[in-house]
Amino acid sequence: MRKEASNPGSNYQDGQWNLVHLKFLTDFMEETGLTTASVAELVGISRQAVYYWFKKDNVRISMIYKLFEAYGYKIEFDLIKERPTEGEPARVEMEVERESKTGKKLEFLASALKRYNIYREEISPKMGIGTTTIYYWLSHDDVFISYIYKLAELAGLKVTIRITPNND
């Protein structure tokens, strides 16, 4: 049996979808009282399109950025190592300011590829995509979020998401 979300009129039922990639979004919606209708209005699409995101557990990352910006929040993604590999010395990574220098949404992806020596030619076949696909994502500054999670899993990385209110 599914329980209704605490926000009446949200049209989102907890447990309706088995979310992995968009769980952070439904958690945020529940915390802030956003409904699927208000999300649709903020990004300029239909409610059905938002339902489709949750049905497929996938959305273009540009839509995520657009939603959070429109709602007055900043969202930052990063890919980090969960734990050192065997034989690698343990090191404490200091929290660094990850402010985008280029303003690109996928700067975190380009940075992680470089930081962890992940080569497109090696990871692309494992992901079932062409070797130029990752280059395409970076040059067009957009990707479906499921690919970020898939790349992270194959590379032994963890997707981290930081959401903060804009202080303009």
What annotation goes with each model-predicted range?
Residues 1-32, 87-117, 162:
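A short, Lys/Arg-rich alpha-helix, primarily the initiator
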Residues 24, 35, 60-63, 119, ...:
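Residues that mark the N-terminal boundary/hinge immediately upstream of a DNA-recognition element
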Residues 26, 37, 110, 121, ...:
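Residues within the helices of the helix-turn-helix
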Residues 29, 40, 68, 124, ...:
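The alpha-helix within a helix-turn-helix
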Residues 33-51, 117-135:
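Short alpha-helical DNA-recognition segment
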Residues 54-55, 71, 138-139:
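DNA major-groove recognition helix of helix-turn-helix
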Residues 62-78, 145-161:
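DNA major-groove recognition helix of helix-turn-helix/homeodomain DNA-binding modules
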